[in-house]
Amino acid sequence: AGTFWKGGNVWVRRTVNVPEISKDETLYLIYSNDDIATFYINGVKVFSTNEVHHNANVALDAMATAALKAGENVISATCEDTGGLAVLDFGLAVKREGEKLVLLNTAKQISADVQATQTHYNFVCGPIDLQVTFTAPLLLNDLELLSRPVNYISYKASSNDGKKHDVSIYFEASPRIALDYPFQDSMSEIVYDGDMVYVKSGSVSQGILQKKGDDRRIDWGYFYMAGDNGSTVAGVGKASALRSCFVQGGDVNSIGSKGGNDSGRMALVQNLGKIKKADGHVLIGYDDIYSIQYFEKNLRPYWNRNGDKSIFDEFNSAAKEYSSLIKKCDKFDRELMLDAENTGGREYAELCALAYRQAIHAHKLVEAPNGDILWLSKENNSNGSIGTVDVTYPSAPLFLLYNPKLAEGLMNHIFYYSESGRWAKPFPAHDVGTYPIANGQTYGGDMPVEEAGNMLILTAAVCHYEKDASYAAKHWGMLTT
């Protein structure tokens, strides 16, 4: 349990027991601060910062290390809150001896090409050229596909010396992908369903929608990585054991099928045999179970808004549609680059491609209890607000262009908030909460002129792009109040 701190200045002393320290060990100060902080060990200044940090670390220099002794030591800190959030936390850590290096050679990256829905990488791995593509089929005209929580990692391996070579592809994922902080307990396992084999991981606690705010990572629901059962072998265990097994040509499944924390690394292996050319892919996804709390009601993700689908249904659909979706993504990426380049030149086109996924992934698609589409944004490092109107406004052109219904989804929650009487002020709210909890505005200040202007202009833009004034008519009472 922490000590409540309202703001201003705070001073903290902690007594810690330190065992005998080896000269070969590196000690670190682990700290979080908001805002200005200075840290000391036994009266010796270690570190000072004017910037906000969360779970950061700094190696102790020779003077700070020399100030430590075996037994009791006093770590102290002072922190000044200059406004907004206030936090101070700190401790010591010792760097553990690293795991033995198993994968001795590093692939040489030749290129990276970021497109709207895909990123393409080229590597040279000795006598093998390897192309790797990450695909997120975020096609905005298809809401079912847009909300499907499954992406692809594809690869093409080809000999660069004209000879056949034994080729196997190894994929590894850490359980940290499903945790807020690294020290949380996790559990990973292998799951078989139909023609697919999965590795799955999630936190032990599974506190659904229990956290909100900035610098938070989802720690409920489960991460999945999957491949065709006929060509994919799965394993769970320590990273060193899985990698050693792979390098030695063993079966990673023999390492284990279930494990927690450090023993919960997940691996998939696809053995291509002795080849000159081959290709394949795996699927990755995340089932968040419930995505948003919307005025005291927990909402499922849009793809499972009726609660009648499973994550395995989504993976199966993604597997069946792999070839067709890759073609659609290739076509869309080409068209976006061509349109953008014709409009603003090559550099502008590259910026559009870079921003496409970023803008989309800043939002979550759910359906409101009244059937409205909700396309809810999250502010990063700015209160963590959800559905912020002045964040909606600059992202709106993308959604107006490709699917105006999503632009409606940027505003539906704000209209509902006022029309329901929950927000009684004569201008739009700034937000509807702190992500992912949308129970009402949490930002400290109103912005009546800015937010009203944003809502009026965007409503007019939706009607213009839809060539239909129905959306404005639906909310006419609020627009003219």
Describe each region flagged by the PLM.
Residues 1, 62-99:
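An acidic-aromatic loop/edge-strand motif
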Residues 2-11, 48-56, 256-261:
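Extracellular beta-rich ligand/substrate-recognition surface
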Residues 5-19, 58-62, 120-121, 266-268:
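Short beta-strands within extracellular/lumenal beta-sheet-rich domains
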Residues 16-43, 75-77:
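Aromatic-lined ligand-binding clefts that engage carbohydrates, nucleic acids, or primary amines
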Residues 31-35, 114-116, 149:
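Short coil-to-beta strand junction motifs in C2/discoidin
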Residues 31-38, 82-84, 160-163, 288:
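Extended, low-complexity, turn-rich repeat/linker tracts enriched in Gly/Pro/Ser/Thr and Asp/Glu
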Residues 73-75, 96-106, 120-125, 138-150, ...:
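Acidic/polar, glycine-enriched structural segments that form the non-catalytic walls/loops
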Residues 309-325, 384-481:
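Aromatic-rich carbohydrate-recognition surfaces in CAZymes
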